[in-house]
């Protein structure tokens, strides 16, 4: 049994305003990595950050980060360090700001397991007028196989910023409230990758699904992008159409 899901999906829109972003995926084989600062849910990436340790441990943590401080002499840096240790509120504010800075600098690409979910089509694919990309992770061993399932919990993750900052960032990226569990989300998390592109193997994109409300213009734009892809000799991508089921609240998928 494979350790990876057979397929992962990304919902999106396709119109004149974002055709270049769709071209990035279909033609250039690149995924846009968003910053958590751009997420629509302010609770997404919320965390309970702790910074507990001995004075010597906290002093060592501050000392290790003083290389990024410019314009101060070694003596001034030492004074600043000791003043911060003597002021817990100031130290806490610095730790939280550092955590948020690293968090917002991380790049995130989101996927789901379900290409037929009515809410996903409504919320992320222009009210069923958009598209959904299908990826096969085993064809992208250096990228999409790194997608990790999100954990759903009522509690924020606890981040030990003193001893395990990277683990804390990762846990924060992969924790959401259970109200979002219907998304069955997986995420790729790239430190310092916010608002940049992540290349993937062209063979990893296998299918594209048109929403049940996708217009003829949307389908024409998609066909044009697929022609650009074909001109680069990339593997062919199948196109499907989502259709409203005649007597049940669900969509069916069929080839176009």
Please annotate each region the language model reported.
Residues 1-256:
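Partner-binding and oligomerization surfaces adjacent to conserved cores of proteins
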């Amino acid at each position: 049994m494979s350790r990876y899901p057979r397929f992962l999906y990304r919902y999106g829109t396709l119109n004149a305003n974002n055709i270049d972003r769709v071209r990035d995926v279909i033609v250039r084989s690149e995924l846009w990595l968003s910053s958590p600062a751009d997420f629509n849910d302010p609770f997404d990436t919320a965390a309970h950050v702790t910074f507990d340790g001995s004075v010597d441990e906290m002093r060592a943590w501050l000392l290790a980060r003083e290389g990024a401080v410019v314009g101060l002499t070694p003596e001034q840096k030492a004074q600043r360090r000791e003043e911060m240790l003597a002021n817990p509120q100031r130290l806490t504010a610095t730790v939280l700001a550092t955590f948020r800075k690293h968090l917002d600098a991380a790049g995130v690409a989101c996927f789901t397991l379900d290409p037929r979910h009515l809410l996903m089509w409504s919320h992320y694919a222009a009210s069923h007028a958009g598209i959904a990309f299908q990826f096969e992770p085993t064809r992208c061993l250096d990228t999409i196989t790194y997608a990790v399932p999100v954990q759903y919990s009522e509690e924020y993750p606890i981040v030990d910023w003193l001893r395990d900052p990277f683990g804390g960032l990762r846990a924060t990226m992969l924790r959401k409230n259970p109200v979002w569990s219907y998304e069955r989300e997986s995420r790729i998390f790239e430190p310092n990758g916010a608002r940049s592109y992540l290349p993937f193997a062209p063979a990893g994109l296998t299918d594209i699904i048109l929403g049940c409300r996708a217009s003829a213009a949307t389908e024409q734009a998609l066909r044009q992008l697929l022609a650009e892809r074909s001109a680069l000799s990339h593997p062919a991508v199948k196109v499907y159409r989502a259709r409203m089921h005649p007597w049940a609240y669900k969509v069916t998928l069929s080839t176009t």
